[in-house]
Amino acid sequence: MNKLQREAVIRTALELLNDVGMEGLTTRRLAERLGVQQPALYWHFKNKRALLDALAEAMLTINHTHSTPRDDDDWRSFLKGNACSFRRALLAYRDGARIHAGTRPAAPQMEKADAQLRFLCDAGFSAGDATYALMAISYFTVGAVLEQQASEADAEERGEDQLTTSASTMPARLQSAMKIVYEGGPDAAFERGLALIIGGLEKMRLTTNDIEVLKNVDE
């Protein structure tokens, strides 16, 4: 298979993923849809895990449009824009969060991660805090999408309103709180959670004055 054919395999696999989900995505089914023998896929993907890694990379390449800082970004707008863009990329495909979880980043993703770290360090974060900040937001985003996609699949299977079903067993305070969450929907829940994380990071960031003081000490 040449490069073009490899890209065709990935494109077809993403289409199949949307049709049958991660569990139904097998190399046998993929080969059938492509009209080739199953061993032909092993030229590029030695197993399903390698295929999933390629799909995860493709999801980000196609849909993650704010993966690196823009000229008009400050650290807050970048973290928010990056997380929202990452979330959209995962939501663009059925089981997108499950596909992404546990994958190994390819070289292009590592380069982008390095650019993100450099940007946050220049904004006043220590290398450690910048790393943990990116990890925390990434984990939060993947977890939020994982829960959303699982909840949507569960609601479709059950064919019932989860809030109505469980409301009678909830304490009054929890019932009111969950009503806010369900009425706001997953978008509002994600944005609020992200705002709380970014607000917390503000407390850990060095100010411009702090940076200048450290520079003077080093000199």
Swiss-Prot record:
The keyword Repressor applies. Residues 3-63 form the HTH tetR-type domain. GO terms for biological process: negative regulation of DNA-templated transcription; response to antibiotic. Residues 26-45 bind DNA. Tetracycline binds at H64, N82. Signal peptide: none annotated. The keyword Transmembrane helix does not apply. Gene3D superfamilies: Homeodomain-like (1.10.10.60), Tetracycline Repressor, domain 2 (1.10.357.10). It holds the Pfam family TetR_N. Mg(2+) binds at H100. Keywords: Antibiotic resistance, DNA-binding, Magnesium, Metal-binding, Plasmid, Repressor, Transcription, Transcription regulation. GO terms for molecular function: DNA-binding transcription factor activity; metal ion binding; transcription cis-regulatory region binding. TetR is the repressor of the tetracycline resistance element; its N-terminal region forms a helix-turn-helix structure and binds DNA. Binding of tetracycline to TetR reduces the repressor affinity for the tetracycline resistance gene (tetA) promoter operator sites. This is Tetracycline repressor protein class C. It comes from Escherichia coli. The gene is tetR.
